[in-house]
Amino acid sequence: MVAFEKLEKLLGYSFKNKELLIEALSHPSLRQHHEYKDDKDYERLEFLGDAVLNLVVTEILFKNFANYNEGNLAKIRSYLVCKETICVVGTKLTLKDYIIMTHGEEVAGGRDNPNNIENATEALIAAIYLDSNIETTRNIIGKLWAEFIKIQNLTDYDPKTALQEWAQASSHHLPIYRLIKREGAAHSSTFTVLVKVKDYKQIGTGHSIKEAEKNAARKLLHKLK
């Protein structure tokens, strides 16, 4: 099985026009290299992919979050299409192994550069759109972004689970909760809990440890958005 076939298997999509796939994975550094005759790279596809991703994510949110107002939908969309989220999706697709770049770019760390992974991911979305149709592209984006969209559904009523799934989706360690303060009488205590995921921290308070943990998780999720 060749490399592109492995990627296509991860995508659940086989390209009819392989040249589009190659263009989506071609780093701009190739244009300055005399060994490469084709001057195409992923920048134009990235431009289109950004627009397609925003359209599809907006449509998904509009249909699935009927009780959310425009402001809340905009916040969720900004999280779903931000550089960090796109980079996580591209990393799960192991795009760094497929990006075609010059030796100089690779030596400079280009294969692990989050910007390159993000750009190639958006270009790949555009390539799928041009090679197929909006419906196929919508289905693939829905699958690749499913865990992040699920997190948004969980945030309000089960923030601890939502935070755990965000950590797993982002390849971080699981959240750690620590009681840092207890105030007041036994029958009316206020608890303060610190939650930490990698370098992200937030505190929450409540009249029980469980409530404080939920509030800390909810606040951290909103901070991450």
Swiss-Prot record:
BP term (GO), one: tRNA processing
Subcellular location: Cytoplasm
Domain RNase III, residue spans: 4-133
Residues annotated to bind Mg(2+): E46, N119, E122
Active site annotation, chain numbering: D50, E122
A GO term from the CC aspect: cytoplasm
Domain of life the protein comes from: Bacteria
Record has Zinc-finger as a keyword: no
SUPFAM superfamilies: dsRNA-binding domain-like, RNase III domain-like
PROSITE patterns according to UniProt: DS_RBD (PS50137), RNASE_3_1 (PS00517), RNASE_3_2 (PS50142)
Catalytic activity entry: Endonucleolytic cleavage to 5'-phosphomonoester
DRBM domain segment(s): 158-225
Catalytic EC class: hydrolase
Subunit structure: Homodimer.
Protein family membership: Belongs to the ribonuclease III family.
Role, per record: Digests double-stranded RNA. Involved in the processing of primary rRNA transcript to yield the immediate precursors to the large and small rRNAs (23S and 16S). Processes some mRNAs, and tRNAs when they are encoded in the rRNA operon. Processes pre-crRNA and tracrRNA of type II CRISPR loci if present in the organism.
Name by which UniProt lists this protein: Ribonuclease 3
Organism in which the protein naturally occurs: Rickettsia felis (strain ATCC VR-1525 / URRWXCal2)
